[in-house]
Amino acid sequence: SRKAVQALNLFGAEHCVGDRAEQDYTGKVLVLSPDTLKESCWSQENQLWYAHDGFGCSPHTIGRSVRCTCLGDGEMTRWNRNEFIGVLDDKFLPEWAKPKLAELQAQEQTDAPTMGGMNMK
């Protein structure tokens, strides 16, 4: 229900930037659709995910899976590209999410050079 979503100040399409169909999600903060979450899990903390990689990051591949980390609790998992509303506009990034985001971005930079072979599972 729209009202419940608004009451919880959940993120929606109005907080996202760019054309979803054309965006590469790699390294972006993504907004998970509330429809994907159980209602008991509805919160901004559970909606913001940092996208690492996965075929689903690219808009024109057949694969849909995006490997990402939750900015709320640090859980890493895979979601499908279509389960995200889009890329969060930086200006809506909450204060609580900034340290986690900075940490994940720093990790990406340290990890990058050592990833010689693509380790596809």
Descriptions of predicted regions:
Residues 1, 26, 96-98, 117-119:
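Generic N-terminal leader/processing signal
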Residues 106-121:
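Non-Sec secretion/translocation targeting segments of pathogen effectors
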Residues 1-38:
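Mixed-charge, Lys/Arg-rich low-complexity intrinsically disordered regions
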Residues 69-109:
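Intrinsically disordered, low-complexity, charged/polar segments
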Residues 34-81:
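Basic/aromatic-rich interaction segments and small domains that mediate binding to polyanionic partners
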Residues 1-4, 26-27, 33, 63-76, ...:
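Extracellular, surface-exposed passenger/stalk and repeat segments of large secreted bacterial proteins
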Residues 8, 50, 112-114:
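Composition-driven detection of intrinsically disordered, low-complexity segments
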Residues 16, 22, 31, 58-60, ...:
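Intrinsically disordered, low-complexity, compositionally biased regions/tails
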